From Swiss-Prot:
Residues spanning the membrane: none
Source species of the chain: Sodalis glossinidius (strain morsitans)
Organism lineage string: Bacteria, Pseudomonadati, Pseudomonadota, Gammaproteobacteria, Enterobacterales
Gene: rplT
Keyword tags: Ribonucleoprotein, Ribosomal protein, RNA-binding, rRNA-binding
Alphabetized HAMAP family for the sequence: Ribosomal_bL20
Name the UniProt record assigns to this protein: Large ribosomal subunit protein bL20
GO molecular function, one term: structural constituent of ribosome
Family: Belongs to the bacterial ribosomal protein bL20 family.
CDD domains found in the cross-reference section: Ribosomal_L20
Function: Binds directly to 23S ribosomal RNA and is necessary for the in vitro assembly process of the 50S ribosomal subunit. It is not involved in the protein synthesizing functions of that subunit.
Length: 118
C-alpha cells in the first residue's frame, strides 16, 4: 500500500487559519502556530460577546427610558409598573426609541402610567 503524505491537507488547513487571521497584527497574521491561537481566542470572544451584546443593549434601553421617565416626573420602575397596570405592552427597545425620537408620545405614555398607578 502506498504511503499517504499529508502535505496537501496540512497546507489547506494552514491556509484556512491564516485566511481567518488576515488583518491581525504581526506574527498573529503570518505564523500558523500563533495565528491558530489568535483565531481560537477571537472565536471565544465573539461567542461571549454575542451574548453580552444583548445584555448591554437592554442596559442602554433601560438607561434611556429611565432618563426620559424622570424628565416626566416618574421613576423607571414606577413607569414600567404603570404601563403593566395600564396593559400597555411595549417592549423596552421600542420605549427607548420613543423616548429618544418622540418626546410627546413618551410624555403621553408617562401620563398614562402615572394615571394607572393611583
Amino acid at each position: 500500500m502506498a504511503r499517504v503524505k499529508r502535505g496537501v491537507v496540512a497546507r489547506a488547513r494552514h491556509k484556512k487559519i491564516l485566511k481567518q487571521a488576515k488583518g491581525y497584527y504581526g506574527a498573529r497574521s503570518r505564523v500558523y502556530r500563533v495565528a491558530f491561537q489568535a483565531v481560537i481566542k477571537a472565536g471565544q470572544y465573539a461567542y461571549r460577546d454575542r451574548r453580552q451584546k444583548k445584555r448591554q443593549f437592554r442596559q442602554l434601553w433601560i438607561a434611556r427610558i429611565n432618563a426620559a421617565a424622570r424628565q416626566n416626573g416618574i421613576s423607571y420602575s414606577r413607569f414600567i409598573n404603570g404601563l403593566k397596570k395600564a396593559s400597555i405592552e411595549i417592549d423596552r427597545k421600542i420605549l427607548a426609541d420613543i423616548a429618544v425620537f418622540d418626546k410627546v408620545a413618551f410624555a403621553a405614555l408617562a401620563d398614562k402610567a402615572k394615571g394607572d398607578l393611583v
